[in-house]
Amino acid sequence: MDLDRLDLNPRIVAAVKKAKLRSVKEVLHLSGPDLQRRTHLSSPDVQLLLRASASLLRGHGVCTALHLLRQEGPFPEQHQRLSLGCPVLDALLRGGLPLDGITELAGRSSAGKTQLALQLCLAVQLPPRHGGLGAGAVYVCTEDAFPSRRLQQLIAQQQRLRADVPGHVISKIRFGHQIFIEHAADVDTLLQCVREKVPVLLARGMARLVVIDSVAAPFRCEFDGAALALRAQRLLALGAELRRLSCAFRSPVLCVNQVTEAVEEQDLVAGPPGMSPALGITWANQLLVRLLADRQRPEEAPLTPPGRTLRVVFAPHLPASSCSYTIAAEGVRGMPGTACS
């Protein structure tokens, strides 16, 4: 933070700059006696400096619920989102994925879950002014091989999808070099990856998005009905580690999930009738946002092309709502005028 914004005598500010302290945070990292030695200021001057620095960093005023709703609060970073690369989908999620917490994307096969995950891996690399975070992504595959051919197709079509981004910005980004791929076929490997490898990339600023595709696969393979307690324990461990990483590094976590055919009465965390995200209530409690990608089956509407819908099942900042989307060569696009609550 700029030292020139301090409401102090210019003599004190000049002494601070002469001591090669470049920001208010650096001032507050030092004790009063240390500041006296470095700046050669008197004790009263140092106390004035510390109080002014603390006030400037903390800020003033009251933040109301209306300010938060209008995104006018004193902490604008809490409103920052990762864009999905489509204005219609961003409008559905009020800007995109939140940076703190786990977002789940569940859905049937061929609904476009992996397509949207790949699109986010490219969107995160754009500068913040264009909805990105200016960093790469970690993509953890747990069942299928990484879809590299589709990724290359999306990279080649970025200018068509993101017409809002100047061409010279897109051309400077080496999209394929900033997606770090890991394979984890079992729960132990997945936990090891999340605990040891992913934090290194996040700490170095090389990645700001974590994708797990899919979270259900290793748990379905290793745990049968007799080991539900152990499965719940491992799910809790995975969820806690992902939430810790997301909050510590201000990085969104996207977990792709499978669905099961629901034969019992609909519950509060399930999706539309007949579909329920896998892993049950234990996993649902780890999530901040649950999205459901639904694809209409050919037998449900044989005379029309299969339709796709993205639904908000639950989120603390979003109402239950949905919109239709299509998948083209350039990526996933929401259909204008199809949003509903």
UniProtKB/Swiss-Prot annotation:
Function: Involved in the homologous recombination repair (HRR) pathway of double-stranded DNA, thought to repair chromosomal fragmentation, translocations and deletions. Part of the RAD21 paralog protein complex CX3 which acts in the BRCA1-BRCA2-dependent HR pathway. Upon DNA damage, CX3 acts downstream of RAD51 recruitment; the complex binds predominantly to the intersection of the four duplex arms of the Holliday junction (HJ) and to junctions of replication forks.
Molecular function via GO: ATP binding; ATP-dependent DNA damage sensor activity; DNA binding
Complexes and interactors: Interacts with RAD51C and RAD51. Part of the CX3 complex consisting of RAD51C and XRCC3; the complex has a ring-like structure arranged into a flat disc around a central channel; CX3 can interact with RAD51 in vitro. Forms a complex with FANCD2, BRCA2 and phosphorylated FANCG. Interacts with SWSAP1 and ZSWIM7; involved in homologous recombination repair. Interacts directly with PALB2 which may serve as a scaffold for a HR complex containing PALB2, BRCA2, RAD51C, RAD51 and XRCC3.
Family, similarity comment: Belongs to the RecA family. RAD51 subfamily.
GO process annotations (BP): double-strand break repair via homologous recombination; double-strand break repair via synthesis-dependent strand annealing; positive regulation of mitotic cell cycle spindle assembly checkpoint; regulation of centrosome duplication; resolution of mitotic recombination intermediates; t-circle formation; telomere maintenance via recombination
This protein's name: DNA repair protein XRCC3
Keywords: Acetylation, ATP-binding, Cytoplasm, DNA damage, DNA recombination, DNA repair, DNA-binding, Mitochondrion, Nucleotide-binding, Nucleus
PANTHER family reported in the protein's UniProt record: DNA REPAIR PROTEIN XRCC3 (PTHR46487:SF1)
Coiled-coil regions listed in the entry: none
Major site of localization recorded for this protein: nucleus
Subcellular location: Nucleus; Cytoplasm; Cytoplasm, Perinuclear region; Mitochondrion matrix
CDD domains, alphabetized: XRCC3
Annotated organism of origin: Bos taurus (Bovine)
Residues where N-acetylmethionine is found: M1
Record's keyword annotation contains Phosphoprotein: no
Gene name per UniProt: XRCC3
One GO term describing the cellular component: cytoplasm
Keyword RNA-binding part of the UniProt annotation: no
Cross-referenced Gene3D superfamilies: P-loop containing nucleotide triphosphate hydrolases
InterPro entries: DNA_recomb/repair_Rad51_C, DNA_recomb/repair_RecA-like, P-loop_NTPase, RecA_ATP-bd, XRCC3-like_C
Binding site for ATP: G107, R108, S109, S110, A111, G112, K113, T114
